[in-house]
Amino acid sequence: MRNVPYTVGNEVEMDEKYTPYNHKGTKIDGVEPKHRGTPATKRGLSNQQICIITAIQRFTHTIARTLNYGKPSSLDLLRFGECLESKSFVMLDGSNSYNELLESKNCTKKVLISHESYDKFNHLNTVNSFHKLIEERLQKYKGVASKYINRYNALFIMQRETQGMDNTEKLQYVLLRLKNIYKITRLKDLKNEWLFA
């Protein structure tokens, strides 16, 4: 996994989002095409589900990465752990896979199993809202190929972080994010594009 541009810390909500595996646009010999909306053939969490691990620092940064199929192992979460600051307060659901990561980072955890355990401060509403955005966008795009899911994760993060901004602020945000990656030669062309439709 490459170095992340920023980390999340202090109060962090962590959770997973599962989407069906999709090889859209690629014909695979011996594999029957799956029509949109049909369920997976295996029940529950299996290798037919892609896991998007999400960590959100409240009011600031979001990190979403896809590392594996099905339920993430503790090794997957340790690889994801480079984006988590040490000694953070982490709120998560009842998954035991996070224990090794949180111990290695010396983090305090709060397990929130159901909505009855939520209060004003301890909740997973932010990460669940982000997962709802992912679900809506994937439905709007009519599915995306799983090999590109991390690119779409980056797009979803940018859409979340620019919610409520006007187009000028969004343009400044994009330019700041692209500052060290690409050199934009014509700002006029970029202003005319609908980056966040």
Please place each PLM-identified region on the residue numbering.
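Residue-level recognition of single "structural anchor" positions
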Residues: 1-197
